[in-house]
Amino acid sequence: MAAETASGYIQHHLQNLTYGQLPDGSWGFAHSAAEAKAMGFWAFHLDTLGWSVALGLIFLLIFRMAAKKATSGQPGGLQNFVEVMVDFVNGSVKDSFHGRSPVIAPLALTIFVWVFLMNAVDLIPVDWIPQLAILISGDPHIPFRAVSTTDPNATLAMAFCVFALIIFYSIKVKGLGGFIGELTLHPFGSKNIFVQILLIPVNFLLEFVTLIAKPISLALRLFGNMYAGELVFILIAVMFGSGLLWLSGLGVVLQWAWAVFHILIITLQAFIFMMLTIVYLSMAHEDNH
């Protein structure tokens, strides 16, 4: 345990491995939340970036292996698994997406599997990866968070990528004029041109808030659920370090019970992120909403 107190232990496990410019002007790693905050916008969460890229590569490698080994005869276990995943996502897209785009199904599959893998890291005991980072670095105080989706920077980045696609397809399908009209002529309208002009600011305010709420809610929903789940695992780990036999025994029971329940959470959150992406992009392909 890198920190001596329970509060210090919790804070240590909730801090990212942050690299940026220190107050003295040099570049290095932050060893406290205050140092990380002082680094400002151009601070890099290397643990989030590293795990996100690594899990993305694992996803690509697994599916590439399945594609190369695919046969029309008796499929293997990996091919069966990939086919089930593809059929599941393809069915979800057909049920929820009402436009035509060859990008949506691959995007939905990528989002579901990638988010699921990032969430699944939360099932690894909370001390294992941070302790490995300490052994490799030789620094007993270095923080390291392995669950990328407990970092709001990661979830917001994914959500705003989806938001960029929403804007792109809205303009592509409806035209720039149609997109602007969608923001300014709805939900209130009038046959009187003068009244309609007066309603434009009201419509724009309502539609803009609705539009910008999509990526924010998408990101914060995933972050909030995964952060809460990670915090519960950390609190259970504190029980093991309490020194009380009965509390440690309770921690064992809670650890397994929460891990089993958390399997549902990590799968459900990946599914929700994927489905909302499909729905938002379907709305972008529709002429009216």
Swiss-Prot record:
GO terms for molecular function: proton-transporting ATP synthase activity, rotational mechanism. It comes from the Bacteria. This is ATP synthase subunit a. Keywords: ATP synthesis, Cell inner membrane, Cell membrane, CF(0), Hydrogen ion transport, Ion transport, Membrane, Transmembrane, Transmembrane helix, Transport. It is found in: Cell inner membrane. It comes from Pseudomonas putida (strain ATCC 47054 / DSM 6125 / CFBP 8728 / NCIMB 11950 / KT2440). Key component of the proton channel; it plays a direct role in the translocation of protons across the membrane. Belongs to the ATPase A chain family. The chain crosses the membrane at residues 43-63, 104-124, 160-180, 193-213, 232-252, 259-279. Its main location: membrane. It holds the Pfam family ATP-synt_A. NCBIfam families: ATP_synt_6_or_A, PRK05815.1-1. CDD domains: ATP-synt_Fo_a_6. It is a multi-pass membrane protein. GO terms for cellular component: plasma membrane; proton-transporting ATP synthase complex. The keyword Aminoacyl-tRNA synthetase does not apply. InterPro entries: ATP_syn_F0_a_bact/chloroplast, ATP_synth_F0_asu, ATP_synth_F0_asu_AS, F0_ATP_A_sf. Gene3D superfamilies: ATP synthase, F0 complex, subunit A (1.20.120.220). One of its GO terms (biological process) is proton motive force-driven plasma membrane ATP synthesis. F-type ATPases have 2 components, CF(1) - the catalytic core - and CF(0) - the membrane proton channel. CF(1) has five subunits: alpha(3), beta(3), gamma(1), delta(1), epsilon(1). CF(0) has three main subunits: a(1), b(2) and c(9-12). The alpha and beta chains form an alternating ring which encloses part of the gamma chain. CF(1) is attached to CF(0) by a central stalk formed by the gamma and epsilon chains, while a peripheral stalk is formed by the delta and b chains.
